[in-house]
Amino acid sequence: PVVETGSALFANFPKDHELHQGHSFAPFKDEADLAIVIRTRAPWYPPSNGPSKAVVAVIDESPHRDNMAYQSLQADLYLEGNVAQTLRDLADAVVRMGVDETAVQKRRARLSQSHDRIRQTRLEEQSEARHKTPIDPVWLCAALGKGMPDNTIYIDEVTSHTPLLRQHIDWNRPQSLFTRQGGLGQGLGLSLGIKLAKRDQPVVTLIGDGGFLYNP
C-alpha cells in the first residue's frame, strides 16, 4: 500500500492506481511489518504514534535536516542517497529474492477493494458538498479536478485547506503538484516560473487570502 501524507509537497503517486490508499497511515499502523518513509519530515504525529511493530526505514537524500530545530523520525534504518535510484535498487533486490506470487495477488486484490472504497467515500463527500452555500472547498476542488485536463499543473498555497486539496483534486502524472517552500507569498511567483517552464500545460494556482496579500 502507498499512503501520501495530507501535506505532501508534490505529486508522488498516481491517485487512480489501485495501491494508492489515500492520505491516512492509521489503517496500517498496527498491521504493517515494514514502513518505508520516503522524503518525509514527519510521517506521523506525535512521533510516538508510529507503527507498533513495523521496522521503519527512511529513504531520503538528506534524512536528517540541519534546518529543522526538532526532528524525531525514530527510524530503524536510514538509506541516504538518490531516492529514485534507491527505490529502483530495492525493487530489483525484491525480484531477485523471489516473492510468493499467490500472496501478492491476494494482497493486491484486497488493496484494490480498499482503494475503491476510499474513492467512493470521496465521491460521496463531493456530492454532499455540491449544493452548499457559500461554495464548499471540497466541491471547488472536485469541480477543478473534473473540469481541467489531465496534464494540468496545480500550485498549492491554500494552507488551511491543503488536506482537502490533496484528497479532492485528482492528478495522476508526475509534476502535477507543486507547493511553495518557505513562508507565505511565494505561490504566484512559483506559478509564473512553472508556466514559463511548461508553456504547453495549464497551470492552476490555489492561494489563500493571506498568501495573496503577502505576495511580493
Where are each of the predicted segments found?
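General beta-strand structural signal in soluble alpha/beta enzymes
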Residues: V2-T5, V37-I38, L79-G81, Y154-V158, ...
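Glycine-rich, acidic loop regions that bind phosphate or pyrophosphate groups
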Residues: E4-S114
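Short, basic, glycine/proline-bearing loop/turn elements
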Residues: A8-H17, E31, R122-R130, Q175-R180, ...
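A short, small-residue-rich loop immediately preceding and capping a beta-strand
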Residues: F28-R39, D200-Y214
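Short glycine/serine/threonine-rich phosphate/pyrophosphate-binding segments
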Residues: P43-P47, Q186-G189, F212-P216
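Short, glycine/acidic-enriched loop or turn micro-motifs at the edges of active sites
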Residues: P63, S160, F212
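Active-site diphosphate/adenylate-binding microenvironment
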Residues: S112-D200
